[in-house]
Protein backbone atom coordinates (compact mmCIF):
# COMPACT_ATOMS: atom_id res chain seq x y z
CA UNK A 1 0.00 0.00 0.00
CA UNK A 2 1.39 3.35 -1.05
CA UNK A 3 0.49 5.20 2.15
CA UNK A 4 2.35 2.68 4.32
CA UNK A 5 5.40 3.11 2.10
CA UNK A 6 5.19 6.92 2.39
CA UNK A 7 5.16 6.57 6.17
CA UNK A 8 8.00 4.04 6.18
CA UNK A 9 5.76 1.39 7.73
CA UNK A 10 4.88 -2.19 6.98
CA UNK A 11 8.20 -3.68 5.90
CA UNK A 12 10.45 -3.79 8.95
CA UNK A 13 10.12 -4.33 12.67
CA UNK A 14 10.30 -1.05 14.56
CA UNK A 15 11.51 -1.02 18.18
CA UNK A 16 9.17 1.90 18.91
CA UNK A 17 6.22 -0.13 17.67
CA UNK A 18 7.37 -3.17 19.64
CA UNK A 19 7.46 -0.97 22.74
CA UNK A 20 3.99 0.37 21.94
CA UNK A 21 2.71 -3.21 21.54
CA UNK A 22 4.26 -4.10 24.91
CA UNK A 23 2.42 -1.19 26.52
CA UNK A 24 -0.84 -2.27 24.85
CA UNK A 25 -0.32 -5.75 26.29
CA UNK A 26 0.37 -4.30 29.74
CA UNK A 27 -2.65 -1.96 29.68
CA UNK A 28 -5.05 -4.67 28.50
CA UNK A 29 -3.34 -7.48 30.43
CA UNK A 30 -3.28 -9.49 27.21
CA UNK A 31 -0.51 -12.01 26.54
CA UNK A 32 -0.17 -11.05 22.88
CA UNK A 33 -0.38 -7.53 21.43
CA UNK A 34 0.38 -6.33 17.92
CA UNK A 35 0.57 -3.36 15.62
CA UNK A 36 -0.46 -4.94 12.35
CA UNK A 37 -0.14 -3.27 8.95
CA UNK A 38 -2.45 -4.65 6.27
CA UNK A 39 -1.28 -4.69 2.67
CA UNK A 40 -2.82 -6.03 -0.54
CA UNK A 41 -1.71 -9.63 -0.06
CA UNK A 42 -0.19 -9.79 3.40
CA UNK A 43 -0.16 -8.56 6.97
CA UNK A 44 3.00 -7.38 8.68
CA UNK A 45 3.45 -7.14 12.45
CA UNK A 46 5.36 -3.87 12.71
CA UNK A 47 5.03 -4.06 16.48
CA UNK A 48 4.84 -7.27 18.49
CA UNK A 49 4.65 -8.18 22.16
CA UNK A 50 4.43 -11.81 23.28
CA UNK A 51 4.23 -12.14 27.06
CA UNK A 52 5.73 -14.91 29.13
CA UNK A 53 2.65 -17.13 28.95
CA UNK A 54 2.84 -17.50 25.16
CA UNK A 55 4.06 -21.03 24.28
CA UNK A 56 7.26 -21.50 22.28
CA UNK A 57 5.56 -22.85 19.13
CA UNK A 58 3.30 -19.79 19.01
CA UNK A 59 6.32 -17.50 19.41
CA UNK A 60 8.06 -19.35 16.58
CA UNK A 61 5.01 -18.90 14.36
CA UNK A 62 5.08 -15.15 14.97
CA UNK A 63 8.82 -14.73 14.46
CA UNK A 64 8.59 -13.94 10.74
CA UNK A 65 5.96 -11.26 11.46
CA UNK A 66 4.33 -11.83 8.05
CA UNK A 67 1.00 -13.56 7.45
CA UNK A 68 -1.40 -14.09 4.61
CA UNK A 69 -4.20 -11.57 4.50
CA UNK A 70 -6.58 -14.54 4.89
CA UNK A 71 -5.30 -15.24 8.43
CA UNK A 72 -6.55 -13.51 11.52
CA UNK A 73 -9.14 -10.88 12.22
CA UNK A 74 -7.27 -7.64 11.51
CA UNK A 75 -8.19 -7.57 7.79
CA UNK A 76 -11.87 -7.55 8.83
CA UNK A 77 -11.21 -4.57 11.10
CA UNK A 78 -9.52 -2.68 8.26
CA UNK A 79 -12.29 -3.43 5.75
CA UNK A 80 -15.04 -2.49 8.24
CA UNK A 81 -13.04 0.47 9.60
CA UNK A 82 -14.48 -0.36 13.03
CA UNK A 83 -13.18 -2.00 16.17
CA UNK A 84 -13.91 -5.71 16.58
CA UNK A 85 -14.50 -7.50 19.88
CA UNK A 86 -14.55 -11.31 19.95
CA UNK A 87 -14.76 -12.59 23.51
CA UNK A 88 -14.62 -16.16 22.21
CA UNK A 89 -13.95 -16.60 18.50
CA UNK A 90 -15.59 -20.03 18.65
CA UNK A 91 -18.93 -18.34 19.32
CA UNK A 92 -18.83 -16.79 15.83
CA UNK A 93 -18.99 -19.29 12.94
CA UNK A 94 -17.59 -16.67 10.56
CA UNK A 95 -14.44 -16.35 12.67
CA UNK A 96 -14.13 -19.78 14.33
CA UNK A 97 -12.75 -21.40 11.17
CA UNK A 98 -9.95 -18.89 10.74
CA UNK A 99 -6.50 -20.53 10.43
CA UNK A 100 -5.18 -18.67 13.50
CA UNK A 101 -7.58 -20.63 15.70
CA UNK A 102 -5.88 -23.92 14.80
CA UNK A 103 -2.35 -22.70 14.04
CA UNK A 104 -1.85 -20.30 16.94
CA UNK A 105 -4.68 -21.20 19.28
CA UNK A 106 -6.27 -17.75 19.43
CA UNK A 107 -9.56 -17.79 21.32
CA UNK A 108 -10.28 -14.08 21.87
CA UNK A 109 -9.53 -10.92 19.90
CA UNK A 110 -9.82 -7.19 20.42
CA UNK A 111 -8.68 -4.79 17.71
CA UNK A 112 -9.19 -1.26 16.41
CA UNK A 113 -8.26 0.28 13.05
CA UNK A 114 -5.42 2.73 12.52
CA UNK A 115 -7.01 5.35 10.29
CA UNK A 116 -4.60 8.11 9.37
CA UNK A 117 -5.29 11.76 8.59
CA UNK A 118 -5.73 10.99 4.87
CA UNK A 119 -8.52 8.52 5.66
CA UNK A 120 -6.47 5.42 4.87
CA UNK A 121 -6.87 2.41 7.16
CA UNK A 122 -3.22 1.45 7.66
CA UNK A 123 -3.81 -1.57 9.87
CA UNK A 124 -4.74 -2.27 13.47
CA UNK A 125 -3.73 -2.27 17.07
CA UNK A 126 -4.91 -5.55 18.52
CA UNK A 127 -4.61 -7.96 21.41
CA UNK A 128 -5.41 -11.64 21.57
CA UNK A 129 -5.62 -14.30 24.20
CA UNK A 130 -5.37 -18.06 23.99
CA UNK A 131 -8.44 -18.35 26.22
CA UNK A 132 -11.91 -16.81 25.96
CA UNK A 133 -11.94 -13.36 27.49
CA UNK A 134 -14.75 -10.90 28.25
CA UNK A 135 -13.26 -7.63 26.95
CA UNK A 136 -16.48 -5.66 27.47
CA UNK A 137 -17.00 -1.97 26.81
CA UNK A 138 -13.90 -0.98 28.83
CA UNK A 139 -11.74 -3.14 26.56
CA UNK A 140 -13.34 -1.66 23.46
CA UNK A 141 -12.82 1.92 24.65
CA UNK A 142 -9.24 1.15 25.67
CA UNK A 143 -8.23 -0.37 22.32
CA UNK A 144 -9.85 2.51 20.42
CA UNK A 145 -7.99 5.06 22.54
CA UNK A 146 -4.70 3.21 22.03
CA UNK A 147 -5.26 3.14 18.27
CA UNK A 148 -5.90 6.90 18.25
CA UNK A 149 -2.75 7.43 20.31
CA UNK A 150 -0.65 5.44 17.86
CA UNK A 151 -2.07 7.29 14.85
CA UNK A 152 -1.08 10.57 16.55
CA UNK A 153 2.45 9.21 17.07
CA UNK A 154 2.67 8.17 13.42
CA UNK A 155 1.58 11.64 12.31
CA UNK A 156 4.13 13.27 14.64
CA UNK A 157 6.90 11.11 13.14
CA UNK A 158 5.74 11.97 9.63
CA UNK A 159 6.30 15.66 10.35
CA UNK A 160 9.92 15.10 11.45
Feature annotation, model-predicted:
Residues 124-133:
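Short beta-strand-to-loop transition segments that serve as allosteric relay/switch motifs
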Residues 1-70, 138-140, 144-149, 153-160:
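Intrinsically disordered, low-complexity terminal regulatory regions
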Residues 32, 74, 111, 124:
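Short hydrophobic/aromatic beta-strand element in the GNAT-like acyltransferase core
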Residues 35, 118-119:
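Glycine-biased flexible loop/turn sites that connect beta-strands or occur in inter-domain linkers
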Residues 80, 117-118:
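Residue-level recognition of short loop/turn positions
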Residues 108-116:
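A short, aliphatic-rich beta-strand micro-motif
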Residues 38-44, 54-107:
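Regulatory sensory and allosteric helical modules in signal-transduction proteins
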Amino acid sequence: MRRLHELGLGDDADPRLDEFARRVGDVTRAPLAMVNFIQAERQYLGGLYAGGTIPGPVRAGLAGRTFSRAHGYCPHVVVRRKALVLDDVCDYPRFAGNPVVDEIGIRSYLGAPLIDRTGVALGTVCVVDLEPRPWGRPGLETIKALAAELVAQIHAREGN
